[in-house]
Amino acid sequence: MNNSFKIIAKATSVFSFAFIFMACQNTEVNTEKMEDIELEEQDVEAPQSDVDLSVTYQVPTPNELFTLFSDVEVAFDANLLNSTSNTEKYSSNKIKALNFGVYSTDLAFAANFGEATASLKYFSVIKNLGDELNVNNAFDQLVFDRIEQNIQANNSDSLFNLSNETYYNAYTYLKDNDRGSTLSLIVVGGWVESLYILTNLVDYEVDKELLSRIADQRLTLENLYGFMAEYQSDSDVSEIMASLLPIEEVLMNLESEESSIETGVNDNGTYNLDGGADFFMSQDEFNSLKEAVNALRNSIVESEI
């Protein structure tokens, strides 16, 4: 491996983002199955809700990676977001679903930084796309009113939670109505946009924590493939799976070392799970990943895929 140092990422198993997604929704964690889960070191809030734990979401959410920004010095950059005027280019359901995911990530990014005006603008865009995709239940007037109220109160935490709630509602509706193909496209669009924002924000020499999370996306990609496999008979899904191959080539060739798993509960009531595989990313690999992500993301937002 070349270049001056290695970026290490504690790897998650295929259930890592399932666990994170449930944590974002304040659901409980099934401790009986905890020994089967390999998670990177992070604090996850202890269970407080009575939500059914039998539901497993094996896909990433747009919000999860952006929570790291509170711990590192990263500035909001509106130029990284997909222009809302691009919606005029989106005519097919495939491209609408992909960009629904893109805009959901942009909403999460803006909300994380407390960008109230941008949050409202991107919520309006995904509401309109949701209507066109028949995902109406995720965007009732009550949610819209709550977003406006939080913008007026400059409440960035609630904006972030509402952006997550919107995505969750759309996810649940599509899953419950056997629209996994559309959901697959939304998830891929959101994940690609998250990687695009991250790889264009970080400095390889400085932002080691964010870089480790980027390297960790190898496991997330495996998780995505597993989720989409059920729907690959749909030509739109099989095509987007093929378009991920350049990203897969970089991530799957990262070096790794195995480490033991340790679990526990901290004094503040949060779960701490550490271990799994350690991934290493060189600067050349980071540059190759960034190039592959940029190419796919631009083809999505420009409706060229």
Spans of model-derived segments:
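Bacterial N-terminal signal peptides that target proteins for export
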Residues: 2-13
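C-terminal motif of bacterial Sec signal peptides marking the signal peptidase cleavage site
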Residues: 20-23
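Bacterial signal peptide processing site
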Residues: 25-28
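N-terminal Sec/ER secretory leader and immediately downstream segment
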Residues: 33-147
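Non-transmembrane, amphipathic alpha-helical segments
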Residues: 88, 92-95, 107-114, 118, ...
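Secondary-structure edge/capping motif, primarily at the C-terminal ends of alpha-helices
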Residues: 107-114, 133, 137, 174-177, ...
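Extended amphipathic alpha-helical interaction segments
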Residues: 156-241
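A cross-kingdom marker for long, charged
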Residues: 227, 232-305
